[in-house]
A protein has these predicted regions:
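N-terminal low-complexity, intrinsically disordered segments
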Residues: 1-51
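Sterically constrained small-residue positions within well-ordered secondary structures
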Residues: 3, 56-58, 84
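Long protein-protein interaction modules used by eukaryotic assembly/scaffold proteins
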Residues: 6-23, 27, 63-145
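Short, intrinsically disordered low-complexity segments
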Residues: 38-74
């Protein structure tokens, strides 16, 4: 079976979130997007299926939200990126399932993964001030990032 890779990267434009440079330290540290991640967190709380959401906490290049949906764990990595040529300021959300060793060994289907992607899509599509929402798979994202 030749299945299309999942589109788990969403790129969008918005002036709702800050592009302010850090006052101290090296350029771009901490990464931009904490306010965007906090916004997504608050909007995800409105969905009944989301039983837990923690963060945002800072990783090396993104702000991460830890989400539990229907007993399944996911991470949302939220960050700023220059996309396309010529480069355009964009926001990116990368959605990843978090599985333990047993989950990877037995590859049980994730029943709630598509629901989480739909919830994120609904948040972005219905928020005034967010535009140019594009879902991509890893290869598509790598080609524009």
């Amino acid at each position: 079976m030749n299945e299309e890779p999942s589109k788990t990267y969403v790129v969008f434009r918005s002036a709702l979130f800050s592009f302010a440079w850090p006052k101290e330290g090296p350029d771009l540290a901490p990464p931009w997007g904490k306010d965007c991640a906090a916004f997504v967190k608050e909007r995800l709380r409105a969905f009944d299926e989301v039983t837990s959401i923690n963060g945002p906490h800072q990783d090396e290049s993104a702000w991460t939200l830890d989400v539990i949906l229907g007993g399944e764990r996911y991470e949302l990595h939220v960050h700023w990126a220059l996309i396309d040529e010529p480069p355009v300021d964009c926001w990116v959300i990368q959605v990843y399932p978090v599985m333990g060793l047993i989950g990877w060994l037995f590859r049980r289907p994730l029943q709630h993964f598509s629901k989480l992607l739909k919830n994120v899509s609904q948040i972005l599509e219905t928020t005034e001030g967010i535009s140019d929402v594009q879902w991509m798979n890893f290869e598509e994202f790598s080609n524009v990032y």
